[in-house]
Design a protein with these regions (language model features):
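N-terminal loops that bind phosphate or other acidic moieties
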Residues: 2-132
Length: 132
């Protein structure tokens, strides 16, 4: 599996990995890098570089487009780093990535993220209307 690196403000990425593992089992190829409140861009980048130094090819998912973790890594890409960076990560996106990797196909991470957002009240109303 191509490794996945989750980056976020605070420990959102750490907790997201734990939640995914509740469903998908242990995931040795998911790595996390948290930007903690007392850290700046330099410290975050140093932690990121330490994690990815041992990886040949990987995909990065960030919590928020325009946020510091995403911006720091985007600057690396603009400077010539060669990896994919997606922002707006959610659980459906991570699980979709893992499923695609297991099947040997390419995940459409944007579609996975969008499909993970549902107005449950509207969906339930559709079921109620269909059964009336």
């Amino acid at each position: 599996m191509k490794p996945l690196v989750l980056i976020s403000h605070g420990d959102m990425c750490v907790e997201l990995k734990k939640s995914v593992e509740m469903i998908m089992g242990p995931q040795d190829d998911i790595y996390t890098v948290s930007l903690l409140p007392n850290e700046g861009q330099t410290e975050f980048l140093a932690k990121f570089e330490k994690v990815v130094a041992k990886l040949d090819d990987f995909v990065v998912l960030a919590d928020l487009y325009g946020g510091t973790p995403c911006n720091v890594i985007a600057k690396q890409i603009m400077a010539g780093a060669n990896y994919r960076l997606y922002a707006g990560m959610n659980m459906a996106m991570v699980i979709g990535y893992l499923n695609a990797e297991m099947l040997g196909s390419k995940a459409d991470l944007i579609a996975e993220a969008r499909n993970g957002v549902t107005d449950v009240n509207e969906a339930l109303q559709g079921l109620i209307d269909a059964n009336s």
